[in-house]
Amino acid sequence: MDKRQFLKASGAVVTDTLLSRYISAEQQAATPRTNWAGNYTFHTDHLHQPKTVEEVQQVVKSCAKLRALGARHSFNGIADSTENQISLKQINQVELDAKSRTVTVGAGVTYGQLAPYINSRGFAVHNLASLPHVSVVGACATATHGSGSKNGNLSTEVSAIEFVTADGNIRHLSRAKDGDQFLGAVVNLGALGIVTRITLDVQPTFQVAQSVYENLSMSQLEHHLDEIFLSGYSVSLFTDWQNHRITQVWIKRRLGPGVSTTFPPEFFGAKLATKKLHPLAGHSAENCTEQQGIPGPWYERLPHFRMNFTPSSGAELQTEYFVPRDHAYQAILAVEQLRDHITPHLFITELRTIAADNLWMSMAYQRPSMAIHFTWKPEWPEVKQVLPMIEEKLAPFSARPHWAKLSTIPPATIQHLYPKMPAYQALLKQYDPQGKFRNDFIDTNIYGS
């Protein structure tokens, strides 16, 4: 979720030479590298940019410490390193197997690149994030998600992964053959190895129609929360926490036989919007996906923002907490008590639901969940004061923070929230006994106290 202006992508791809893997610190020091939002500056100037999996193996062997960079859409230090980072942007092959209904993608591929490709060949993935510009591998490694009470997060689409281990060897794990190890390896937080390829399940392409309603009383969620979130294939509620109301309800309806593209004029007292809207009042909706019940392919409706626009910047901060769905309304009321602390620093909050899964480090591990997502103004000193207040309110609900977003929850608490944490720690020790892929984020949140 974001408020920034979007610029149309040129589609140009700049290819680096082989030697760019070894760009010197002197060459990069003049331009400090940051994440996409600009709120985090990476602590190394050593960025390796291999073109092939074989070159990835060489980089891994040559480095004592290494972290994968991804698409830089994380808001914390999960991808950071004080020594070496590796960008797999040029590992961008896509292989569709129509017979097995799978697609294998290189670690540099984004959902915005993948979706049109498989759609043109008659296929789809079941879910997408609100922004299409994140990398497939990075999103799956952090359990990033779209929405839908019956839809698992993006990681649940994974059926196999290929990664380079600390000794430089290639390892494959699959859902079909590797059982628990696979369940522990999908949401790997970048600590298992350098993931080079990932295989996703696909399904026949489908159409979606989207409409928006305005001004839903928050009281309607007390007795109708499940009904509201099940009213579409994917449903998002937006609020600024003022006036006990949901400012907008975005309903994405999966089309099929007998499914209408006509939305009723009222929805639990909320009014059907008469024009296309941006989640933030007063902002142009030009960059949002089509609304008002206009049918379109899945990849042009499931994200909130259009794929052929790419964000020029992201001057914002993000936090997100996952609570059990059966306590969702109580969690909403608990956060609402802090509205006057939250709203001055907030762009918007989005509420969305996700199905339970069995991936060890997923925020939805073994519990149907609701995510409470905050898009903040870039005011970190103030936001940093508000987060512990929110986290205290959500503590009774065992809220799990998004791995790639901002949080102040203590490491010991985070570890307690994941029943399979000891098994995950053992898995990391098996594949990376010397901690080559560990960084401060992993040391703190997975091993800290």
Over which residues does each language-model region extend?
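Noncatalytic alpha-helical scaffold of FAD-dependent oxidoreductases
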Residues: D2-S449
